[in-house]
């Protein structure tokens, strides 16, 4: 009897061990990824710089200040990298060489629809709300027929495909037009990227960097513009402004930057199965951060003479490097809580809140700026243009920030808006399946 009890005990322990080993993989599957609040703050700093850069010429004529804050064409590449980074982080598995299948169900088209519907509702609402502002300028210069065509291009997010019309209506939103194409590509690219091991990812990273460098080099070579500073350059003085537009606005070339971000994310996400040397100085976020700042400041002070295109091809891998290091520093358990780190600063709640309202800032700063600074619009509304009042610039910044905070609370967090957006998204997904 005692022997039977011992056998049962051994069997029970084996059964429990087997059960625990069976459930262990399930825990890994359902385990959520660590949150990366620093990414929100990084988004705010990028958007803040871009928003100020778009209108700084309306507030100052100081050459140094203009050069320091007009490198928007350089910094916007980092915005695409961050978008690709987040997309890969949310749609692939941690410490596994596979994508997250449910993110691409029921079809790959559904992934694109869901990503686009994440930003289209506010974009659409802004188009409607500020349409009178957009039409004042468009109808004045182009007439009603072309304005109607331009409305179709902007509402369909097709404007980035037209080099001379990429900045129609709400100029900064050409970014969303290009990003939309990237989200068409990603559901087909991410599953393959997720399968790659570190060496494969590193090779792909280098190839993407070389490809984007080739594009920028070809442009600079053909226009003899290696030393151009396009951010402050009048279009009439450029040998081929259309060529420049076709490079900086191209959805195809922007997708390369998005893929660089996706590959960067995967390089960090497999750290648990392919170890890296965390003690290396190259893993410190401060190194790429200083190099990025040095690039911007060096060009501002004319210490470094290079075109926006070449600078962007350098800035993009530096930002990818910085983002990977911030990610590793955020999830690392080695630094003590008392130690200073850039990731802890970027995770500060006021900064993450600004990160939360950064998308409304990006959408709203353009049309609000047009009201005060676009000559044909401001003269129609106020009888003068606010470029004559440089002291108004901080007020404009305040108006944008307050408006973004209100929109975040009233529109983005609105349950009815969220429900309507979800219903539209589901309907479009169902339509894509039926086809």
Where do the model's predicted regions map?
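Structural signal for the C-terminal ends of transmembrane alpha-helices
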Residues: 88-96, 135-136, 188-197, 262-273, ...
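Membrane-interfacial catalytic/cofactor-binding modules of polytopic membrane enzymes
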Residues: 228-232, 237, 241-251, 260
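Alpha-helical transmembrane segments of multi-pass integral membrane proteins
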Residues: 250-258, 262-264, 283-416
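Membrane-cytosol interface segments of multi-pass membrane proteins
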Residues: 1-233, 254, 281-286, 344-345, ...
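Membrane-interfacial loop- and helix-cap regions that link adjacent transmembrane helices
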Residues: 235, 241, 268-272, 282
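Secreted, luminal/periplasmic, and some membrane-associated catalytic domains
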Residues: 276-279
């Amino acid at each position: 009897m005692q022997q039977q009890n011992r056998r049962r005990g051994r069997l029970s322990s084996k059964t429990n061990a087997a059960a625990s080993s069976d459930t262990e993989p399930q825990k890994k599957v359902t385990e959520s990824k660590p949150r990366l609040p620093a990414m929100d703050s990084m988004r705010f700093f990028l958007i803040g710089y871009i928003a100020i850069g778009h209108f700084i010429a309306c507030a100052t004529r100081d050459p140094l200040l203009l050069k320091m804050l007009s490198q928007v064409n350089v910094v916007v590449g980092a915005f695409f990298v961050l978008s690709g980074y987040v997309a890969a982080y949310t749609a692939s598995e941690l410490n596994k060489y596979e994508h997250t299948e449910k993110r691409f169900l029921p079809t790959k088209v559904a992934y694109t629809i869901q990503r686009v519907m994440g930003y289209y509702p506010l974009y659409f609402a802004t188009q409607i709300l500020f349409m009178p502002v957009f039409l004042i300028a468009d109808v004045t210069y182009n007439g009603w027929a072309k304005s109607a065509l331009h409305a179709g291009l902007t509402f369909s997010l097709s404007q980035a495909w037209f080099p001379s019309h990429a900045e129609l209506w709400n100029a900064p939103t050409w970014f969303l037009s290009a990003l939309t194409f990237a989200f068409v590509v990603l559901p087909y690219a991410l599953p393959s990227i997720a399968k790659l091991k570190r060496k494969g990812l590193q090779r792909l990273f280098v190839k993407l960097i070389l490809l984007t460098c080739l594009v920028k080099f070809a442009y600079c070579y053909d226009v003899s513009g290696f030393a151009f500073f396009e951010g402050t350059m009048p279009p009439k003085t450029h040998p081929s402004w259309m060529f420049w537009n076709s490079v900086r606005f191209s959805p195809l070339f922007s997708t390369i930057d998005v893929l660089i971000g996706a590959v960067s994310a995967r390089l960090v996400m497999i750290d648990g199965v392919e170890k890296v040397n965390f003690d290396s100085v190259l893993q410190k976020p401060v190194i790429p951060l200083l190099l990025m700042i040095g690039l911007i400041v060096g060009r501002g002070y004319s210490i470094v003479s290079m075109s926006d295109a070449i600078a962007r091809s350098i800035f993009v891998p530096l930002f990818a490097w910085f983002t990977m290091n911030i990610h590793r520093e955020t999830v690392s358990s080695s630094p003590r809580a008392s130690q200073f780190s850039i990731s802890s600063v970027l995770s500060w709640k006021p900064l993450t809140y600004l990160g939360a309202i950064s998308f409304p800032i990006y959408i709203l700063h353009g049309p609000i700026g047009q009201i005060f600074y676009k000559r044909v619009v401001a003269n129609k509304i106020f009888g003068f243009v606010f470029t004559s009042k440089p002291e108004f610039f901080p007020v404009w910044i305040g108006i944008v920030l307050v408006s973004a905070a209100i929109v975040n609370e009233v529109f983005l967090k609105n349950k009815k808006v969220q429900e309507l957006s979800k219903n539209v998204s589901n309907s479009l997904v169902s339509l894509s399946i039926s086809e």
